[in-house]
Amino acid sequence: MHEVIICEKPKASEKIAKALSRNTVKNSYKKVPYYEFEENGKKTTVVSAVGHLYSLSPTNSKQDKIFDIDWVPLYDKDKKKKYVKNYVDAIKKLSKGADKFVHACDYDIEGTVIGYNALKYACGEDSIDKATRMKFSTLTKEDIVKAYENPIPIDFHQVDSGIARHVLDFLFGVNISKYLTDSVRETTSRYVQLSAGRVQTPTLSILVEREKEIKNFKPIPYWLIKAALEDDIIADHKAGKIFERKEADGILAECKNADAVVADITLRENKRTPPVPFDLGSLQSEAYGVFGFSPKRTQQIAQNLYTEGYTSYPRTSSQKLPKSIGYDKILKSLSKNAEFKKHVDALKKPLKPNEGKKTDEAHPAIHPTGTLPKGLDTNEQKLYELIVYRFISVFAEDALQESMKTKLNINSQEFSFSRKRMVKMGWLEHYPFRKIEDEKFPDIKEGDTLKVNEILCEEKETKPPARYNQASLIRELEKRGLGTKSTRANIISILYDRKYIEGQKIQVNELGEHLIDTLKEYSEDITSEELTRKFETELEEIMADKITKDSVIEEAKVGLSSILDDIDKNKSKIGEKLYEAYQESRIVGQCKCGGNLVMKYSYRTKGTFVGCSAYPKCKVTYPIPRGTNVLKTKCEKCGLPMISFGKPRQRACLDPKCGRNGKESTNEVVGICPQCGEQLIKRMGRYGEFIGCSGFPKCRFTKSVEEQEAK
């Protein structure tokens, strides 16, 4: 009897093999590790994929509309993936003659497709009939053994849904991108690689919509009236924003030389319930707000923590913690860490988590497994502690906060101020990532007279809608039903890679904006949220066995064909507009000679650089190292654009000879050091601008400008 277990990643195969037997032997084939053990006359081989081994590819790339596609080995399609061949060869060799197969890839859509394709194409189609499925949410020994001893059938509806998603994304992305690129090439004889996608383009459309709201926004002046009183009290006039200067002047006149009389004091005790457990979206949002991690980075770190067995499966929508995960056991294990123990010991029995409404049939909310980590890097440690403290805090008591709202009369004008103080810290003692409002209450009572030191009148303007950051865009996509928990971060990353968007506070550049404007004018369906949402619903219906994979794909081909026909009818207009936008997007500034500084590509060095549009009359050039972004921010010294580069991201002037790149400090105070409490200031170093502690060299805390701006 020979059994083959197919895992998703090498680390997972090691964990699973060692959990199932003490007699596991590690071997390798073509440098691919695999594990074997024999028990009770059964030989078991544990081998892994390395993520996706197969990818969709056109059967005939010369087709006008690419609808005929098939799965091919990833190494045949992408030269950078040659290493994948060894994994495919290893699975083929080790699975020959096997009597039984176990699909042990991650229990989600992607993991299901990875394992299914490995079985179908590497092991042979007959392997599918001999295969069962392991379902686990952590890579702990207990969960692995339980999943192995209680296998389930492969869910072929989940397989079909996953394959349909891949097919839809491929058909829309490849065809629309091809048609847009061809429209520019056939109109201008220039090659410009343009990209569009089933979810990517509606996402970009949301950002363009916000960009237009900001550009078209007309600020309206207004006035705020405040009273500065004794005991450092600042009270606000009840009118709030006042849009007529005459009204503001009338209030100021009436308050002149008058004291404030306490008219009413309202005290309330407010309960602050513990936070709910993390699902992937809320973890990404919290990590962005606390640490400045991009959603994609958070997802990568969380996946690493899961693979190492320290936390549960991250790609979950659940905010539920079922009893079956073993609260007591996890907390007891965490208590082996002295810092965690203080918080665990303070929890009161019986343990009952404060859960959210969201559920996920496949996995519980993200939680620590209880296995204490070793050798984590700084960012992994940060995210691990965030997950641990969140887990502990959901079992803690409510926090109680007392609020004091005081109404004041200054002559006939009503003002008010509010204060908050903590009565009981509750869960806030266990979750150090929340702001705590704990203010001093003034010793006053109704009827008291307070001295007015000054009546302030602040002139302000209404502000446009805020730009999205990566975390708020993830929330917006989730709210609108676009993408999935697993794909949203990658969609945003693609928009950055395509140079359609830039900055921590996301700004759409000229090419991205013109692309959406052009598509909306000539083929609006491409940008449609409704179309994308419709297919998301149908993909879920495939999983629920309400509709077939083939019917959804055929329906998509009909709709896509209509979109492509619209592009084809307006090819010359679309090509001209997109090429013009592309040319504008390449301009990064103005040269001293009066020409434009534009991004250029060197066929000799196979890299980009900035050069003058007046070449060969003007031969000014600036190097652009790989991984560098040219920003819209201008150098304060020479006026050239700033660039962003390196990890962590640093800033410097485009001109490497500019004096701004020296080591002088700007001394701009940007915050408080979290380690020592001194001021954080902008500094200039060898590699550009960064944030450092003013307490240097005693305190060596630093971070990038981008991390600071993300706050």
Task: Label each region the model flagged.
Residues D76-F101, I206-L207, E286-A287, E385-I392, ...:
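Phosphate-interacting basic helix/loop segments used at nucleotide- and nucleic-acid interfaces
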Residues H2-V4, Y121, S177, P295-K296, ...:
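Basic, low-complexity terminal or inter-domain segments flanking catalytic cores
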Residues C105-Y107, S285, R315:
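Short glycine-centered, acidic/aromatic-flanked micro-motifs in structured strand/loop junctions
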Residues M1-V174:
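Intrinsically disordered, low-complexity regulatory segments
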Residues G41-T45, G51-K82, Y191-Q303, T307, ...:
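Long, highly charged, low-complexity internal segments
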